[in-house]
A protein has these predicted regions:
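TPR repeat positional signature
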Residues: 14, 18-21, 101, 108
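Hydrophobic/aromatic side-chain positions at a characteristic register within alpha-helices
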Residues: 26-29, 116
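Generic beta-strand or strand-like secondary-structure segments
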Residues: 16-23, 40, 47
Length: 179
């Protein structure tokens, strides 16, 4: 059953709408629509940046929030009062989430392309800086050279050593180094 509760972080889905709208624009060339959606998408990005981002710049989500609630990525031992099995699906587990972080980077990239297409210059530098910082963070902190894989990070900076499909967002975002 889908659910929505105001101010509940599990009620916020993944940040993929800028990507979707850019694909729509590339297929149909509807610049009026692009102009209408740009600022709401930018506002959503800023909202997530303010409320779903850790101090190191990485992003978090939850099982329901990321849409992949069946992944074994939440460590119940890190969650206070975790006797409730549902917390595994609903809690962010104090982690930096690889998919949420890469989706934020992709959103920056697509918002930049939209802004350039629309002749908007105000936000481009800040978005480009965030994009560069996120990509650097992901490749420096979330990549395991030993395993050749991207991982979520625990609060202490160590890898959550569970391989999940969330790492494949690095391929979708086209940020994985060629080697």
């Amino acid at each position: 059953v889908d659910r929505f509760y105001r101010h509940d972080p599990t009620s916020t889905g993944p940040e993929i709408m800028a990507w979707c709208e850019w694909q729509y624009y590339k297929n149909y060339g509807d610049k009026d629509r692009l102009r209408k959606v740009y600022y709401p998408l930018l506002s959503f990005h800023h909202w997530l940046k303010n409320y779903h981002r850790w101090k190191d710049g990485s992003y978090w989500s939850s099982g329901w929030g990321c849409g992949m609630d069946n992944l074994p990525r939440c460590d119940l031992e890190l969650i206070p009062d975790s006797e409730d099995w549902q917390l595994e699906t609903f809690h962010h587990s104090y982690m930096s989430w690889i998919d949420a972080t890469l989706q934020a980077a992709m959103s920056c990239e697509y918002l930049i392309m939209m802004a350039e297409e629309l002749g908007i210059t105000d936000d481009v530098d800040a978005l480009r800086d965030e994009y560069d910082n996120l990509i650097r963070f992901v490749n420096e902190k979330m990549w395991s050279e030993k395993d050749g894989f991207y991982y979520d990070l625990k609060a202490d900076g160590s890898f959550l050593a569970v391989k999940t499909v969330a790492a494949f967002w690095a391929l979708i975002a086209k940020i994985a180094p060629p080697d």
